[in-house]
């Protein structure tokens, strides 16, 4: 009869008990009553206020503030280097928003026109001006928008400055998800050639499909990977046209969008 194999692989007398005095760390119990004090004069730290909820219906009157041409990495969107000291202060680091982006309409870097004042300014400046006027704005971008390091601020800053939607020829996957986490709707052109049609100064008068998306209703031409959103656009000269765009929002991501951010959704 065969005998089971034997080997002296384990100590015959067992293991040494070890340090019996070890005490595991306490499990933390968050206390919302505790106040975290941040100096309001600090340039490095700022208490982050939750973003507001997403739309309950269609978007209307979205200003196309910028059409980006060519490569636009997360470093173009939110530069590192000396800006890193402001990572804890969203208002301050937002001054670098898209400061490396090339404007397809004027071939200038970080220069856009405020259609309400007629003056040119840095992208973050005009974004704040639009926000002060209650005018949501969007960016039209080229291929592989947001490639590079997975920089959360590249999405945070866009949302903070009042950009609820970005329309791209294509997105870098991680940045696309980061935008969704911050309540920004990333759309791609159904036909990438339609990028040529749009310009800064155009206005998306209304969307068609966002209301169904946030309500959880089946949309036009939905697929397991997403669905279709139509953009009804008006040029400055009054000419109108329609852009067919696509989204890739999952059920969970729609909830982030509806609540205003993934953090809002997690908080309930």
Regions found by a protein language model. Name each.
Residues 1-268:
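Fe-S-dependent hydro-lyases/dehydratases of central metabolism
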